């Protein structure tokens, strides 16, 4: 359980592919939903593996999400979307005349921010501008839950996850099982035509089990020739 506070915070769920990152994100969202908390989910425009407006896990669970650009200042659309939700859900109460209030017949706005939890999946597909967005959201009092892999297929740091892990209050790094030897897997093995990818291949290629495997350090392979 996370500590109950009066301020926002950032949670990061990371690890290799097939380690259950999105599944853990969805589990936390389900718990928040059961508790009556309101939730807003966002995903990068580049990820459409489970539908354009759906966050999905490899085991089939899904959650509706808003799609936002993954580059530059457009990432701040996350905050703009929350502002619209806040405005749309802000309610007013018409006070009845003679009800004992000091403002008979007046209008009292309620301070309903409408969203308690902000979730962002596949954070590794966003630019580093996402770090500033998440910090701003936490400073505004939101619980921010972010998931994404922290390593490229080369085994190198995959921004912005390392920076998010540095500023987050809570970090959980999950492991998968190596498809080759059964040891704990921490690496993303990219396969091209069933062969290990070349070290000079592009960093971002969106795929599922047909293009990636989870592997341990010893079984992870990069082609150099």
From Swiss-Prot:
Name of the coding gene: tdk
One annotated Gene Ontology cellular component of this protein: cytoplasm
Catalyses which reaction(s): thymidine + ATP = dTMP + ADP + H(+)
Subcellular location, record wording: Cytoplasm
Assembly mode: Homotetramer.
Biased composition (Polar residues): 90-104
A GO BP entry: thymidine metabolic process
Residue segments, region Disordered: 85-110
Protein name: Thymidine kinase
GO molecular function, one term: zinc ion binding
Main location: cytoplasm
EC code: 2.7.1.21
UniProt similarity note: Belongs to the thymidine kinase family.
Keywords assigned by UniProt, alphabetized: ATP-binding, Cytoplasm, DNA synthesis, Kinase, Metal-binding, Nucleotide-binding, Transferase, Zinc
Residues annotated as catalytic: 122 (proton acceptor)
InterPro entries linked: P-loop_NTPase, Thymidine_kinase, Thymidine_kinase_CS
A matching Pfam family: TK
Organism (species): Haloquadratum walsbyi (strain DSM 16790 / HBSQ001)
Binding-site positions, ATP: 15-22, 121-124
Superkingdom in the source lineage: Archaea
Binding, Zn(2+): 178, 181, 216, 219
